[in-house]
Amino acid sequence: MSLFNTVRNTIVPVHKEGYPFVAAFFVASLVLGWIFKPLFWIGMIFTLWCAYFFRDPERVTPQDDDLVISPADGKVSAIQMVTPPAELDLGSEPMLRISVFMNVFNCHVNRAPMRGRIVSINYRSGSFVNAELDKASEDNERNGLVIETRHGQIGVVQIAGLVARRILCWANTNEPLDAGERFGLIRFGSRLDVFLPAGAAPRVSLGQTAIAGETVIAEFASAKGPVISRHS
């Protein structure tokens, strides 16, 4: 496992969800290399790509409870006022939705956009159309979190994509989250939607590249309530 440790510790950390995949590709490379030596190097290319896909770099998150931080690496694909998904129970009034689309080359670890406490987690099965399409918000498999923040409740929805077939969320209801804290992962291409209440103004533009845990995607004008911390 020396190669695995090198990739994890020297190049960039690999998320634990990727360990089985990296190990499987590495073993397959050894087997193929035993059959035909050049196949080992081809297999190693795929092994390194898999480690790259599951990379989990450290991020420096702005410490300001009025800021909304990107929950995912990728491209800002939508900024619009829409009615939030019914399963989030956020009401029927339009909310600001900012969507970040992740392709297969982006880091797929998802991070909390704001500090708060998880009110609910709602999973919905669905199809697997291209996550960049607008209808993916309603048709695709998804997992939605509602987070209570000092500016009210916000929604964060993990949406599976054309290639993605597994949404992972290790957060639990009633748990606190810090801005930039890891809470989930989606394998192989997907999208994150953030739903924000009145008072939030976008700070990104369509097509802009966002970095999870670092890029400010929206901002609230002023504080509305007490800071929600792990000790609240």
UniProtKB/Swiss-Prot annotation:
Q: PTM details?
A: Is synthesized initially as an inactive proenzyme. Formation of the active enzyme involves a self-maturation process in which the active site pyruvoyl group is generated from an internal serine residue via an autocatalytic post-translational modification. Two non-identical subunits are generated from the proenzyme in this reaction, and the pyruvate is formed at the N-terminus of the alpha chain, which is derived from the carboxyl end of the proenzyme.
Question: What are the protein's GO molecular function terms?
Answer: phosphatidylserine decarboxylase activity
For membrane topology, the record states:
Peripheral membrane protein
Q: Name one GO cellular component term.
A: plasma membrane
Q: Where is the PTM Pyruvic acid (Ser) found along the chain?
A: S190
Query: What family name appears in the similarity comment?
Result: Belongs to the phosphatidylserine decarboxylase family. PSD-A subfamily.
- What name does this protein carry? Phosphatidylserine decarboxylase proenzyme
Q: What is the lineage of its organism?
A: Bacteria, Pseudomonadati, Pseudomonadota, Alphaproteobacteria, Hyphomicrobiales
